[in-house]
Amino acid sequence: MGKNVVVLGTQWGDEGKGKIVDLLTEHATAVVRYQGGHNAGHTLVIDGEKTVLHLIPSGVLREGVQCLIGNGVVVAPDALLREIIKLEEKGIPVRERLRISPSCPLILSYHVALDQAREKARGEFKIGTTGRGIGPAYEDKVARRGLRIGDLFHRERFAAKLGELLDYHNFVLVNYYKEPAIDFQKTLDECMEYADMLKPLMLDVTAALHEMRRDGKDIMFEGAQGSLLDIDHGTYPYVTSSNTTAGGIATGSGFGPMYLDYILGITKAYTTRVGSGPFPTELFDDVGAFLAKRGHEFGATTGRARRCGWFDAVILRRAIEINSISGLCLTKLDVLDGLETINICIGYENEEGAVIDAPTDADSYLGLRPVYEEMPGWSESTLGAKTLEELPAAARAYIKRVEELVGAPIDIISTGPDRNETIVLRHPFG
């Protein structure tokens, strides 16, 4: 019987999911993306060579692994085709192994224009989106007016829907945001070109997944962003527009929760966040700068510098409950090498002095102060360690304390960017 494993982020994204998915796909028949879009940036380093993926599942670098994009993913055809071509230039036969649900909503030029116009209009109160049209595309989907990939293959139907959508969105762009209108004919011609290239990649992904399940194949589900960016469970409104938590798998791929065997939560050994929104343990001192520099904390998608802070056990406990996490993978442990002391946030203190748990929205974080537990750091290098015994005693104590505070086992420890720089204590497919 096959095993079905989920890999998802438990913080605000950028936890190192891509490397771990790539590592574990050695055992998988297929890797599935089920939410998000090309706002994701998954960085893989194999034998020193760096590859950044945005839409295509991280299993693409493993020979023979099928890569599936489920109906919950919003697809920008131009971005997808650029990514395919870039990988093909490296000799990877992407089109042989990539298949996409025709039910995926499309991201088109007017979504990007709306996204960027809104952020510009918000000024200092901007959400901090990637400006790639993700939110507006999900809005069209929920409003039941969006175009889907399957519409591309019916020109007359597509043109009629596109005309209605442009009438609606151009009115907002021109009259409210004072931005130029999107041209109908140019958009239609571009989309028809995309149709010819995308048609061979279409597949009923839900049916394919259940066929694999019945055949006893191992399947991996690859999450994008992080649990605290979930549209329902994140620090609203500073969130993404999809369900980044485990519940998104059922809706975004048609694969029910009863069939999931193991959910691996990825967490950094410290905390980072890109863009706006609450971040109780954020550091503005030399330690924050140290983490940013040592951790190369710049977004793979936007290039924006990430905000850095101490490990937050409070938000991780919340993510573990929401996702029913089976085990954790602790990444970037090596970034903490050289720190004399390390703090772990164990609670938040409000203005009355009471220690509380994680709030449910962004405004409720105002006035909260992190309560820290201090632990000794270590001077020895953990970079590239492959067994627990190779780690300094203080690093092992830090790992054990994190497990105790969050109530979940750490099954994998990442000690460097390469897929081989990993300690596996319990294998999700084992």
Swiss-Prot record:
BP terms from Gene Ontology: 'de novo' AMP biosynthetic process; IMP metabolic process
Cofactor note: Binds 1 Mg(2+) ion per subunit.
SMART domains named among the record's database cross-references: Adenylsucc_synt
Binding of GTP, residues: 13-19, 41-43, 306, 332-334, 414-416
Gene Ontology MF terms: adenylosuccinate synthase activity; GTP binding; magnesium ion binding
Coiled-coil ranges (or none): none
Primary location class: cytoplasm
Residue positions binding IMP: D14, E15, G16, K17, N39, A40, G41, H42, T130, R144, Q225, T240, R304
Binding site for Mg(2+): D14, G41
Domain of life where this protein originates: Bacteria
Record InterPro entries: Adenylosuccin_syn_GTP-bd, Adenylosuccin_syn_Lys_AS, Adenylosuccinate_synth_dom1, Adenylosuccinate_synth_dom2, Adenylosuccinate_synth_dom3, Adenylosuccinate_synthetase, P-loop_NTPase
Enzyme class: ligase
Similarity remark: Belongs to the adenylosuccinate synthetase family.
Subunit structure: Homodimer.
Protein name per UniProt: Adenylosuccinate synthetase
Species of origin: Pseudomonas syringae pv. tomato (strain ATCC BAA-871 / DC3000)
